């Protein structure tokens, strides 16, 4: 018996311990602990144990009231009810089943004298229970019921307890972890920065065709070391200046180099922007510059309609061309260049053809695009500071055939600097092809390459070249009497709003080719290459290469160190002594050019180390 009596308590304790552990570790009962389940459980408890114990759970029964017998039992001591139960008793005792906070306080003090002397801490507990307990509902006063404070009532249908759920982790996508230099970065966004300047600069993003307004009221001393510190290959942008003269479009492409970049149309306008290298790989089909067409049409109306109205189609006044609605400037002024006239195009031109560029026989500098001709010209009222570069470079489009396009040979009073001609760009889809802008090497490192890289037509350098060549045109020296067919075809194109089909455009390209052949602008490829290499090795050699067609090399000679621009850029020769000598040398150079064979003019173009030359004959796909 002794052993049995000792074993029974141990067995009982083990059973109780196992039940306790199972109840503590098992959480199956937790979801079932809702308000309704608690109310039903309280009803069962009330039926089993009587009314005394159920009053302690009065909170769980919204209809519970307090009997006077119980009031008398707990009159002397602290009542065995929770604050929620006291609130329930108070509200249910009201005929309207609602009470204000002060009325609840008063009811508790009247029925339980303990709380009269218990201080004010219990009142805070009453307020907390009213606010936090789901069983109590706040009822606002009606307008016809004067008084202070809202009513409190018992919610007979409390909301079920919602089981807390673990928040799901947000899946990380690989696409979100993009680098700051990805194609989706904000560098293509081109935020619109509008300042109080009277003439902002409209910059066209060549990738997204977004338009950005930049403040053009910048200090003229800004250096590309701070604003344009990337390489030349990273610079390609056409900035459209909206001037106040009608619908004036001034295209000012900006490039960077070791010297300062300044003045466009006015000294206050300096659009500068960088485009990453990846933008250059996009095809020209993504460009859509509608303003270029409007610019060309305005130029045509201002210059060529006036010339057509004259009998001889010649002697266009310089004033009329200066008042042209199209003002296209492409300027670069090294810090040491002779630059005294801010409105003239006297700066040495920073373009990809600085040290000589290579274009294949049918692909010369101005890539002719199809349907929106753009003609850029701004006459230079200061001839000694007219920009000088390579001879005119015609660019035939992939559709060669028989019709002139307006690329006039512009006469210049200087013997070594034939004025650049105009470049008309057309594209069938109203989009404009452009040239890649690459940093030219120093003149001592010029090599005779004969190819064009695959990104030659990928960026805005064609626009830059056309702006550069047409920027210093002196229209008073132009003789268009021998190119009446060209003028007529241009007039017909203008009548058709420049909506040319392929055949008409091919005619224009063919006439353009004939025009440059007759004017001597298309020179021998071998001679040009030979002179580019030879002249680059001897930049100070006397001007005996004028007749060879390599006028760019000849223009670099006999310059003092103070006037030397950075390597790879055309130099501004000093003003020659007399106009007579100038004109004589100029005519001699022109006559020698006319005697050159009409072969494709080759220019050298500096290529990056990883660039691949494009030797494909684009005329073969026509």
Curated annotation (Swiss-Prot):
Q: Name the residue ranges with Low complexity bias.
A: 332-357, 404-422
Q: Which residues does UniProt assign to DNA binding? A: 77-168
Does the keyword field hold Phosphoprotein?
yes
Q: Where is this region: Disordered?
A: 145-178, 249-274, 316-450
- Give TM regions: none
Compositionally biased region (Polar residues): 249-273, 316-331, 358-379
Q: Which Gene3D superfamilies match?
A: Winged helix-like DNA-binding domain superfamily/Winged helix DNA-binding domain
Q: Where in the cell is it found?
A: Nucleus
Give the chief site where it resides: nucleus
Q: What cellular component GO annotations does this protein have?
A: chromatin; nucleus
GO aspect biological process, one term: male meiosis I
Task: Give the UniProt keywords, A-Z.
Answer: Differentiation, DNA-binding, Meiosis, Nucleus, Phosphoprotein, Spermatogenesis, Transcription, Transcription regulation
Write down which residues bear the modification named Phosphoserine: 223, 295, 489, 606
Q: Name one GO molecular function term.
A: sequence-specific DNA binding
- PANTHER family, A to Z: FORKHEAD BOX PROTEIN J2 FAMILY MEMBER, FORKHEAD BOX PROTEIN J3
What is known about what this protein does?
Transcriptional activator of MEF2C involved in the regulation of adult muscle fiber type identity and skeletal muscle regeneration. Plays an important role in spermatogenesis. Required for the survival of spermatogonia and participates in spermatocyte meiosis.
Q: Could you tell me what this protein is called?
A: Forkhead box protein J3
Tell me the organism: Homo sapiens
At the highest ranks, the source species' classification is:
Eukaryota, Metazoa, Chordata, Craniata, Vertebrata
